[in-house]
A protein has these predicted regions:
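Alpha-helix/helix-capping structural signal
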Residues: 8-9, 43, 109, 128
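Alpha-helix C-capping/helix-to-loop hinge sites
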Residues: 13, 31-34, 51, 55, ...
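Acidic, PIN/NYN-like endoribonuclease modules and their adjacent C-terminal/linker elements
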Residues: 2, 108-145
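Short beta-strand segments at enzyme active-site cores
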Residues: 39-42, 124
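Active-site neighborhoods of divalent-metal-dependent phosphate/nucleic-acid chemistry enzymes
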Residues: 79-125
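Short, well-structured N-terminal submotif of metal-dependent ribonuclease cores
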Residues: 1-40, 55-68, 132
Length: 145
């Protein structure tokens, strides 16, 4: 199955003490084992690195560890989806026309990458946020791990 992972799924999969680790880790492991075909947005690489290195409460990891987690778990097994300049502009124009603002802008860009990947499942911890940005047909493909 083709699966797209939001950044928050990757972060949860990498950190054993994350509250969603036990549901997120199998998603990444299935991709690494070749059981599923995995996709992530290019933006998620930088976002995962930033989150991993700045987690509150002493839970952050060293920059070299963050890079190792991304390199070994994502770059070796997942296809990286990039939006073209035209796709980026179209997505932002649609967001503006629909009144999408603030942090939801990143959700709409990640969702556009998920759609571009052709994934049958779009995994996110923000199911409601993603589902509120799209039509009924796509909503059925958006789920938590």
């Amino acid at each position: 199955m083709k699966v797209f992972c939001d950044t928050n799924v990757l972060v949860a999969a990498f950190l054993q003490n994350h509250p969603h680790h036990h549901s997120a880790r199998p998603v990444v492991e299935r991709v690494k084992a070749g059981q599923d075909q995995g996709f992530v947005a290019a933006h998620s690489l930088a976002e995962a690195y930033a989150v991993l290195t700045r987690l509150p409460g002493g839970n952050q990891v060293a920059p070299t560890v963050a890079w190792q987690l991304i390199s070994e778990n994502v770059l070796r097994s997942f296809s990286i989806i990039t939006l073209t300049a035209k796709e980026y502009a179209q997505t932002l124009e649609k967001a503006a026309n629909e009144g999408i603002e603030g942090g939801r802008t990143y959700d709409v860009l990640l969702l556009a990458s998920g759609v571009k990947s052709g994934a049958e499942r779009i995994y996110t911890m923000n199911v409601r946020h993603f589902q509120n940005l799209t039509d009924e047909k796509l909503r059925a493909r958006i789920t938590a791990p």
